């Protein structure tokens, strides 16, 4: 249906699902991707940007002219900056200096202020800096890693959308990368209720296998693998953890672009790789859905899409 919206924020959600045709082999389960880059800010994080700001407005913690500060690996910041611009709020984003140039420039384009922290300190360094600045100036911190509005919006929207999109068809597996854990927690809980036999797979970087009980470490899969177990992550919702190597994520993001015309980011490559492995295991006649969190255009300055 063609929509005429009163605000850009009304266009968040209701993202399409597409089937992979050339990457999956014929003896595997069918693999589907939910294209979260079809949100107006080009990522899944638009959903939580809107949810966290609107929850704070309802609670009286935010009003026009106020300042939001958030530690973010990029896409949450873009979602928050977009929603803040639409609502007349000021946004300051704190992120590790390892994040791509596109992300930084996009934030500035939306009118946000940027504070960069040392990449070696990871998200922990960004969180610490944001908390210091918030305390000093009285800014509002949405705190995506422990804000209940984060998984809740995925219960209310993402999970419900998937059930509506698949209807009475059985969905056999759901694959999502873990950044804050909001998507897998919220959508996963709804999917378990709708499809009791579904298997849910949590994707994390092999080089920072914290959910698997390993040690945090540097990795190249931007947006997932924060190096700690987030407060809002329901660790009971997933059945299996799927570690993905940097090279696997890069290879499958590139292949999806070249062979399917689907241009995702690095964590999208990780989700696609994991979904294809799950599909092989499940076999023909089953259905696997993976979340594609962001658009590959956001990674053109990274090693993901460098050409001679």
Curated annotation (Swiss-Prot):
Instruction: Return the EC number.
Output: 2.5.1.47
Protein keywords: Amino-acid biosynthesis, Cysteine biosynthesis, Pyridoxal phosphate, Transferase
Q: Positions modified as N6-(pyridoxal phosphate)lysine?
A: 45
CDD domains, per the entry: CBS_like (cd01561)
Q: Name one GO cellular component term.
A: protein-containing complex
The reactions it catalyses are: O-acetyl-L-serine + hydrogen sulfide = L-cysteine + acetate
Q: Output one GO BP term.
A: positive regulation of core promoter binding
So what family is this one in?
A: Belongs to the cysteine synthase/cystathionine beta-synthase family.
Q: What is this protein called?
A: Cysteine synthase
**Organism expressing this protein natively:** Bacillus subtilis (strain 168)
Q: What gene codes for this chain?
A: cysK
